[in-house]
Amino acid sequence: SAAAVSGGLLPTSRSSDSVFGSAKSVLDIPRSVTVLTPELMQKLGVRSFDDIARVIPGGERPNFYGVPGTPFIRGDFAGTFFNGMQRAFQRNEMPTSFGSLEGMDVVRGPAPGTFGATQGGGYINFLPKSPYYDKFRGSLRTTIGTYDYFNTQLDVGGPLLAFGRPMAYRISLTSQNADSYYKNVQNNYISIYGALKARLTRDVSLYTGAEFYSYRSNENGGWNRVTQDLISNGNYLVGEVADRTSAAAGGYVLPSGVPFIGFGASSATIGGAQFDNSGGAIIPPASYVATLSPQLRALLHPTTGAYTSAFFNAGGKALTTKIGGNQVNADPGDFANAQNFLYFADLVNTRSASSTLKNQFLIDYIKSDKISSYGYAFAMEQFIIEDKVTLEQRFKGLLTSLSSGGSVRYSWAKQLQDFSSEPFSRRDISNPRITANSIILTGPQRPAFGDTRNFWAQSSATELYQLALFSVGELKFSESLSTYFSARVEGASFTNAIPMEHERNARRGQRVAKGGKNYYMFSLNPVYKLSPNVSAYVSALHGTALTPSQGGNVGSEANFGETGLIEGGLKVSLLDNSLFAALAVYEGRRQRFNNFTNAQDGVRSKGLEFEATWLATKQLSFLANFGVKESHLVRMPGFRFGATQEYYMPLVAGALFTDGGDATGLIRKNNPEGRFEGAPQGSANLIASYNLGNGFEISGGPRIRGSYYLNHERTLSLPSTVIWGGSVTYRRGPIQVMLEATNISSEDYFIGSDPIFASNTVITKAPPIEAKLNVTYKF
């Protein structure tokens, strides 16, 4: 029954089958695994992938425009599995629904052979809400919060008898309507989930379920025109850019009206005519210009009044205004809508006490549409179907268990996008009015006359076929020493075509590429029991990381990259099993697909991680984790937004300013060791809980993050922070009331951006104190 296996606060309170297939205590699994039970998720307020950083060592997730579609582990994308089956990859098409899950296991580092090729940082295995066989039960939960947050969930389930067979069901309905701290950004969704378990015969059981999820929101572009002065002092570069509106665009701006500047070697210093005449320079408002000296006013552009290189060479400073963290690059008319259908089925044949045959089946369908009026559009559809068969066997002797099987998987994905460089900085977000000059036609939109084709570009429709064989087992050399091994061989073939919707491509409707990739994965994972409650382990893995492009497309061999891991650790369960602690050190390498260069970005990483849960007394408990890591670029990053220095942004804000490799020389100058920036090297979390008696409990603690550079060029840095959170809970009979607060001290801190793409032009200031009141009635 779901109630029996959900677990409590300690990671050892339930077993995990999210690494080597068979259920084991986390104490005996030779990998870094964080077990999240329903109790722990509620205590820590885990509602999306944005919250995972609070519960894993060294956790940090950049802002992918406000839509947490994919987890981020050890500084890289991570895979998402549902009941052991890999879900569709979607970077930020929708927040992955948590409405269907009971708990989750977070595995740091590449997946072993049983799970297959996924993203390089690690993976999260969702444990679905399971039906109740023992008795009928349910809960009704309502949550209200700051910024008109309203969320409600009805969850019911119980046993039933159908066709003479014992069965059990579970239904969960979740609805949310919420504004946010950020102006013009909402987060509304509905989730409908149902699951059924049935004993079909004495030795055959079925577990099946489905979820429909609909999301309505828009992207959060954060602050644009990023400078160190903006980060440190909230001083924002004020002013519009040259008017490029046109009748053909209906009074707005055509994409061709946005200047393009490619950084060259000379761009590390203030340039000349290419910047002064690009139309990308900011035009400061007249009221601000009046504060300048006559000498500096004379150096502004004589026709447009825009900044010039001469202005800055003479010592001029860009004019700024104070801006709040809630003023972001978002338009009330923007949207980022998505629908998702997920279906799963497990058919299990218990052939004997030592042999089980399992067939797992998954369908995952996603459709999303986005438009942001500053000049970005994206649309995608993705369909995944996979069937996996596993024979699990247990033996006596050296080989104690062996699970072998095969998998066949088909993926279809279509993405349509406007262009790879977005004019993030063109709009003056300090202006309370969104001007026509800051609205750029994009994606499905069309000019009113002339060339009336839509603006989709860099689009693709791909098909991917994967066929795999895998095996995982345990060799038990003694009562103290065991070794887990896993192996996988897989073949993949793909095709890539230009979608018919891409009207400006002469090859639309045609196949433009096809190919294939054969690869293998293996790992050895010895674990030594120093005592029944102390385990030391080593894990060595070589495999393949599969990183699709943003919409899930796999159309190149570059989507497949090698990955490797060496990890060693110690796990203990002490003090009558009231204290669990785990320490791990690791070194790894991974290649991540860059969908702007269609090539791999290589990263080498090493780090140390610690986590502990201690039930000190019946009233007092502690949860703590700590992580430090250091990552280095294997090669210079590819095509992306270029880094600017303080005086440089005002000259190019209205343009598309891009870099490739290190054209400015700033990485070699400021970051000679080639460190992969964009996240703190060190972070820690601590939560203490105390039961006051009479139904009351208080919890709280800090999240500590070290200072770090936002970009590889090290022109932007973020300060260290201490972020406090806490909750007060009251339980009486079937009712639970919890008041939770985050960032209690309203600490100024920021959510960075992926340094591969947009960290030079986008940053998001985190919200000040937020509160939620949660009332749950159980029946």
Q: PLM features: what roles do these ranges have?
A:
Residues 584-589, 601-713, 774-778:
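Gram-negative outer-membrane beta-barrel transporters
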Residues 220-327, 422-455, 494-518, 548-555, ...:
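Solvent-exposed loop segments that connect transmembrane elements
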Residues 622, 631-632, 704-711, 730-779:
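C-terminal beta-signal and adjacent terminal beta-strands/loops
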Residues 12-15, 28, 32-38, 43, ...:
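Periplasmic plug
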Residues 295-301, 305-307, 339-366, 379-499, ...:
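Face-selective signature of the C-terminal outer-membrane beta-barrel domain
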Residues 191-403, 410-411, 580:
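Outer-membrane beta-barrel domain signature, strongest for Gram-negative TonB-dependent receptors
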Residues 100-102, 113-194, 200-206, 341, ...:
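Outer-membrane beta-barrel translocator/receptor signature
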Residues 399-419, 452, 456-590, 615-617, ...:
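Structural signature of Gram-negative outer-membrane beta-barrels, strongest in the C-terminal barrel
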